[in-house]
């Protein structure tokens, strides 16, 4: 079995780690960074940029630069959270034919898993460059509070990126693995508070060690899949926009370029205010009107930022209470608090969490890397590289079906350890009913339509009988990824119907296969583009060095030779403006051939100085050819 890499596919940043011998190693990407911005850009010339290169050009290409895609994955367009994001994002969120939230880039509709796959491909390539081998398997993390549709969509993204997703694990659980594996912690109960770029989770986890085997058992989990650093940024952006409007009478919300600059500045200011008491947001030439250019210069204090976001931080505390209650624990029974996610660097967040638990959170876990490290550990467990670790995760939400009167009847309660299987017998509501519809739901509300609909299917061919007589056994089976399989069986006839729940939304197999093919085609296009760039660089270098030599010794060349070199230079220069690699390489070869005369002209010429011929000839024996470098006098 090859390496199974661990990927933290984050809202704001992503990270990849591997088991390297006995150690877990977080890998640096091609830019030399250990985390990669989860930003994807589609340029005018058809190139796809991922990470820092995408982030750098965001200001000039806001409509085609996509970020925070994780907030849309597995969601419906009409969802309240999606509608809220749709009003503030510079890119276009649209409804797919099946009602999912998709994105529109350059007049083309794209699914969130298809876009997230570009980030996963970069993570895959980072690991392949480090290991020198092809990677096909991964463990990918998701927020603990992700529902079935969001988990399925994440697996789809992995497939599109060319990865077999061996396991989906919850981010707080992964962080607990990273924390607990390399420490002699003994038996402990910990709380993992995970506030990332777009999602929030809290998990209560018990770590037990028996005869050298560590068991990580999740007792309870809770959270909010639409609360994170992006929301903190948006509070700051709205404040800056409102202040600018007060001063200048101009609403920047109508200017996508200005909003993109403002987003970057707001995020930077938020980060600075974690260590400083105040900062200046200074954006010259933010916009212009008939009276001339407008400049934005606003001073923001830490106290001001905290007043803007305090309600968001408080929102994260309610799930803490519910998780503790579900685990049957009091605050005093939590021995360690682990902070995960970049937003937990904010002093206000740290203070509120410390006040809630009555103890300071641990500072020895890297909030940006812990989740990827835990994913790599789980990959090591699956491949056999890591021994004596058992992970017992839970289903975050109750699962059930709609029964008579529009009631949700739960078959599997929230915080049930997975994998798990549960069956229950139901019956018909009408006399001689020949079919039943099994409507699968996820959530905690009593009314069926208040919960998340995961899909429905029919069991027909039920033998005619008075209502309440037929016995229909419904079985829910959750696998280790937290993905649900449902079957319904008529116990009288033995007739059975099974489905793996693909939410009524989601990508179908044909769409996934098409996206996989597109991704493979893109990989080939990327390779060709890289080769074209290499040829261009080689051509540019040759142009520069040949011109330099021509300046130095061109006067020693015959007129015909000089003309031939000039023509070859022009031909190469013209080829470099095109997209044809073969043409560029041919013109490089042509220039190399004709510029041989330049090389000859730059060598010492015996017999060229008339009277000094004999002396030159005698000295020639002692001459050693050497490379030289022109040193220009400093002025």
Curated annotation (Swiss-Prot):
Pfam families referenced in this protein's UniProt entry, alphabetically: HSP70
MF annotations from Gene Ontology: ATP binding; ATP-dependent protein folding chaperone; unfolded protein binding
Induction (record text): By stress conditions e.g. heat shock.
Keywords attached to this entry: ATP-binding, Chaperone, Nucleotide-binding, Phosphoprotein, Stress response
Modified-residue entries (Phosphothreonine), positions: 199
Region entry Disordered, spans: 600-635
Domain of life assignment: Bacteria
CDD domains, A to Z: ASKHA_NBD_HSP70_DnaK-like
Function field: Acts as a chaperone.
UniProt record similarity statement: Belongs to the heat shock protein 70 family.
NCBIfam families assigned: PRK00290.1 (NF001413), PRK05183.1 (NF003520), prok_dnaK (TIGR02350)
PANTHER family according to UniProt: HEAT SHOCK PROTEIN 70KDA
Protein name from the UniProt record: Chaperone protein DnaK
Gene field: dnaK
């Amino acid at each position: 079995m090859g390496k199974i890499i661990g990927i933290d596919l984050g809202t704001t940043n992503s990270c990849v780690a591997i088991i390297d011998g006995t150690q877990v190693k977080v890998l640096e990407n091609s830019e030399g960074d250990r985390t990669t911005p989860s930003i994807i850009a589609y340029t005018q010339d058809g190139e796809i940029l991922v990470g820092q290169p995408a982030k750098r050009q965001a200001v000039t290409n806001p409509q085609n630069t996509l970020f925070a895609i994780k907030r849309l994955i597995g969601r419906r367009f009409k969802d309240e959270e999606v509608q809220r994001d749709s009003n503030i994002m510079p890119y276009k969120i649209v409804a797919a034919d099946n009602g999912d939230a998709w994105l529109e880039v350059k007049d083309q509709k794209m699914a969130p898993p298809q876009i997230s796959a570009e980030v996963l491909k970069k993570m895959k390539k980072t690991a392949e460059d480090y290991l020198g081998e092809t990677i096909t398997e991964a463990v990918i993390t998701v927020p603990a509070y992700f529902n079935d549709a969001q988990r399925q969509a994440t697996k789809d993204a992995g497939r599109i990126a060319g990865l077999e997703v061996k396991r989906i694990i919850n981010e707080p659980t992964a962080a607990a693995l990273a924390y607990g594996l390399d420490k002699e912690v003994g038996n402990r109960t910990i709380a993992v508070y995970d506030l990332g770029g777009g999602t929030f989770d809290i998990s209560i986890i018990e770590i037990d060690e028996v005869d050298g085997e560590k068991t990580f058992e999740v007792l309870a989990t809770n959270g909010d899949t639409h609360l994170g650093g992006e929301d903190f940024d948006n509070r700051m952006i709205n404040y800056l926009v409102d202040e600018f409007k007060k001063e200048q009478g101009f609403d920047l919300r109508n200017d996508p370029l200005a909003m993109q600059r403002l987003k970057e500045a707001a995020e930077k200011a938020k980060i600075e205010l974690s260590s400083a008491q105040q900062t200046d947001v200074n954006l010259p030439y933010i916009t212009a009107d008939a009276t001339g250019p407008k400049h934005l210069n606003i001073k923001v204090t830490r106290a001001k930022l905290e007043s803007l976001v305090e309600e968001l931080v408080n929102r994260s505390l309610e799930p803490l209470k519910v998780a503790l209650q579900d685990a049957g624990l009091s605050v005093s029974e939590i021995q360690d608090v682990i902070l995960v996610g970049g937003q937990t660097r904010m002093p206000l967040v740290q203070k509120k969490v410390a006040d809630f638990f009555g103890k300071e959170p641990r500072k020895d876990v890297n909030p940006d890397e812990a989740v990827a490290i835990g994913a790599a550990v789980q990959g090591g467990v699956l491949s056999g590289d890591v021994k004596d670790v058992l992970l017992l995760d839970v289903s975050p939400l109750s699962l059930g079906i709609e029964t008579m009167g529009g009631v949700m009847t739960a078959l599997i309660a929230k915080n049930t350890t997975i994998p798990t299987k549960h069956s229950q017998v139901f019956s018909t509501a009408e006399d001689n009913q020949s079919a039943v519809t099994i409507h699968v739901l996820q959530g905690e509300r009593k009314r069926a339509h208040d919960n998340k609909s995961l899909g429905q299917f029919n069991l027909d061919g039920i033998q005619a009988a008075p209502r309440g007589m037929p016995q229909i056994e419904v079985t829910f089976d959750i696998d280790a990824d937290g993905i649900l399989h449902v079957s319904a069986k008529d116990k009288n006839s033995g007739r059975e119907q099974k489905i793996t729940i693909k939410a009524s939304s989601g990508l179908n197999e044909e769409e996934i296969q098409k996206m996989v093919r597109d991704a493979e085609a893109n990989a080939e296009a990327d390779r060709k583009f890289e080769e074209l760039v290499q040829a261009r660089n080689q051509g540019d270098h040759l142009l520069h060095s040949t011109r330099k030599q021509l300046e130095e010794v061109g006067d020693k060349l015959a007129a015909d030779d000089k003309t031939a070199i000039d023509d070859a230079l022009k031909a190469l220069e013209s080829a470099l403006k095109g997209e044809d690699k073969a043409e560029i390489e041919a013109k490089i070869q042509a220039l190399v051939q004709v510029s041989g005369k330049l090389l000859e002209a730059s060598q010492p010429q015996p017999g060229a100085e008339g009277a000094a011929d004999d002396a030159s000839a005698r000295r020639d024996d002692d001459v050693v050819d050497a490379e030289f470098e022109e040193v220009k006098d400093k002025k």
